[in-house]
């Protein structure tokens, strides 16, 4: 009987991509098949996120639930990867001594040999080093699961924002070679993928070397991906405003495969807070980039990230953030209360804002963002949207669902499953808080 792998993923799209590659790797090297039940697994793998304190606490809560499984089956291997593993290293075993393997985002390619070593020696295996992009040289061809796929184009971040743990857990920026990325995209397209999302912690900082020694930026990469046969839609995330270049804006204008949607995190609308965060740009510079982009691509949807309650945030700072949200006309966005991360400069700043006030500000900010997002959805009613059909509706098996260019889920009645993986024109009939309803055009 085939051995089973249970994998749980916390956090960002980079982690989702890494988890999919670990499934490919362990399937090829150890013939492990994925199971939906941890109690049936021979190997349990937890891919972790450390971006906020709550995410880190969740790791140890989950490991605690698996302790009984390990006691009942000592042959089971429990492996912890991702950013918490990178940050904590062997210290994970101080709180969870039954963990067998600890590995970082840059050492996931060593996972098969680490699992084997843990089984043979009965000793813990820990490797959270940063061998740059070596892992991509050791991964099998990606398995295809649906019409959309992530492709990692670079690793790490060198911006060192004062609140962010990423440079310490994933290392500094390293770009994959240009042709390696295109090879992966071509493989995906040959196996039915129609939409790719190019990933990086600072993806618009991509600088990949081509086969002839040139250095290509993200705009060059997007143009090359767009001509891969079968790829009809391109997204990318996550961007830093500092490197949102004119060449990238021009790519948005020139490349029809590049969606009319951009996620461009700003974090705050206060120049004082942006300086404390070491974002290295002002709100005026950010808005200038948006104006230039909207002039090049009228109607483009823009979402962002916001941190509420950063140390020292005053009522005026928060009001400036709310004003930026309104001025910029942001679509649905992500927002969180600031969470100090050990080892980051901001963790040493005095934080004297009451928690209740932080929650009040977050609620007000989210309410405003949701209002604006819903208004954009309402404006889409009556329009015809080209959507990529991805699956059956989660609530009604008689319906299919897909996504618009501006990343909205559309549910529509259809009894033709062959439409999954294809593009379809759908008339938008109704806007709901988190999705749209439509009718398939024949």
From Swiss-Prot:
Disulfide bonds: none annotated. GO terms for molecular function: 4 iron, 4 sulfur cluster binding; metal ion binding; N6-isopentenyladenosine methylthiotransferase activity. It catalyses: N(6)-dimethylallyladenosine(37) in tRNA + (sulfur carrier)-SH + AH2 + 2 S-adenosyl-L-methionine = 2-methylsulfanyl-N(6)-dimethylallyladenosine(37) in tRNA + (sulfur carrier)-H + 5'-deoxyadenosine + L-methionine + A + S-adenosyl-L-homocysteine + 2 H(+). Its cofactor is [4Fe-4S] cluster. Residues 143-375 form the Radical SAM core domain. It comes from the Bacteria. Gene3D superfamilies: Methylthiotransferase, N-terminal domain (3.40.50.12160), tm_1862 like domain (3.80.30.20). Residues 3-120 form the MTTase N-terminal domain. This is tRNA-2-methylthio-N(6)-dimethylallyladenosine synthase. It comes from Pseudomonas syringae pv. tomato (strain ATCC BAA-871 / DC3000).
